[in-house]
Structures are given as C-alpha cells and as structure tokens.
Amino acid sequence: MRFIKLCMIMLLPIIGFSQTLKVGDGLQIVHFNAGWNSANDVEWVKDLENCKIKQCDIATDTDAQSKHEIVVVPTIIIFNEGEEVKRYQADISFSMKATLEEVQEKVNEIYGDDF
C-alpha cells in the first residue's frame, strides 16, 4: 500500500492539473498534503502564530509539488521572504513527527531575527 501511495505521488505531476501555489513575502508556513492522505493531516498547523499559513493539496496543484520537490506528505515548509528556511517531512508511514512546539520555535526564531 505504501508503495502505491509513493507511486501516486510521483505520477501526480504527469496526470494532474495545476492551481499554482504562490509563496509571497514575509514569513509563511505551507502545509503540503493530498486529499487521499487526509487521515494524516497536520491539524495543529492552524495554531501557529506570527506567520501566514497556506494549505496545498498536491493532488490538484502538481506544479507546486514539483517546484518544491514534495516527495512525501504531509510536508511543512517554512518560507521567509519567498525562500525555504526549514522543511519538516512525514516518515514512511505518512505521519508527521514534528510537533507544534518545534515548528513554532523555529518560526519564533525567524520572526525575532527580522526585527
């Protein structure tokens, strides 16, 4: 089953269509996942502070999947001024091991550096 999911992730850029995620200025968190992996959605992302939060479904936004080299979902990427600063990826079971506290600490570190 995991092999099938991995194959689906790799094939999505070929068979899907794009909504094109836009990563802009400032401190942003993008939570990449896929509709077929909603059971492993990272619910706590919405609780992060001092940043803009975006969601991206790689099943429908295959350009973003390719551009940001998403190979496993969920993946959380912290962007600052459009540049990737930190990436948190799920393990082989498609479960996120990073915690709200860990990601918030990194956000606070970056947010503090901007002042």
Q: Where are these predicted regions, by residue range?
A:
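Residue-level detector of flexible, active-site-proximal loop/helix-junction positions
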Residues: W36, T60, I92
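Non-catalytic, surface beta->alpha helical segment in thiol-disulfide oxidoreductase systems
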Residues: I78-F115
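Structural micro-motif
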Residues: H68-N80
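Bacterial Sec-dependent N-terminal signal peptides
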Residues: M1-L21
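A short beta-strand-loop structural module common to alpha/beta enzyme folds
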Residues: K52-T60
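Extracytoplasmic/periplasmic, Sec-exported soluble proteins
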Residues: D57, H68, S95-T99
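Local sequence-structure signature of Cys/Sec-based thiol-disulfide redox active-site neighborhoods
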Residues: Q19-K52
